[in-house]
Curated annotation (Swiss-Prot):
Record's function text: Involved in the regulation of gamete interactions during the double fertilization and to prevent multiple-pollen tube attraction; mediates the redistribution of the gamete fusogen HAP2/GCS1 to the cell surface after secretion upon sperm arrival.
Stated family: Belongs to the plant egg cell-secreted peptide family.
Native source species: Arabidopsis thaliana (Mouse-ear cress)
Gene behind the chain: EC1.2
Name recorded for this polypeptide: Egg cell-secreted protein 1.2
Signal peptide residue numbers: 1-22
Length: 125
């Protein structure tokens, strides 16, 4: 009985080894090169937009408090990149409400954005 069990175990082990060694793995040229991954676009673009958003935080606060302050082009581009190309809920995780995020996104996507129209006053802090 012990020889049957060990034969069965050995057969299953050999079949598993043959199955694993026989499959092809996908090519991963750039996955080991961290510089290529970081310069590839997406991740760095999100970090740059987040850094730009940090520099225009005062502008965004005044945008909501005064209702007449205009957002700059760079600030709107950062909001656009973060909400469309990165994680859409990132602004919410940074402390903005979903209503404030929608107002910012709507203002920056409007044709008159970038400092040429007054801010909407629908969101109150």
């Amino acid at each position: 009985m012990a020889s049957n069990t060990s034969f069965l175990f050995a057969t299953i082990a050999i079949l598993l080894v043959l199955n694993i060694s026989g499959r092809t793995l996908p090519e991963t040229e750039d996955s080991t090169n961290i510089a290529a991954r970081l310069n590839g676009g997406g991740l760095m673009e999100c970090w740059n937009a987040l850094y730009e958003l940090k520099s225009c935080t005062n502008e965004i606060v005044l945008f909501f408090l005064n209702g007449e302050t205009k957002l700059g082009v760079d600030c709107c581009q950062a909001v656009e990149v973060i909400t469309t190309d990165c994680w859409p809920a990132m602004l919410t995780s940074l402390g903005f409400t979903s209503d404030e995020t929608n107002v910012l996104r709507g203002f920056c996507q409007s044709p008159n954005s970038g400092g040429s129209s007054p801010a909407p006053s629908s969101v109150k802090l």
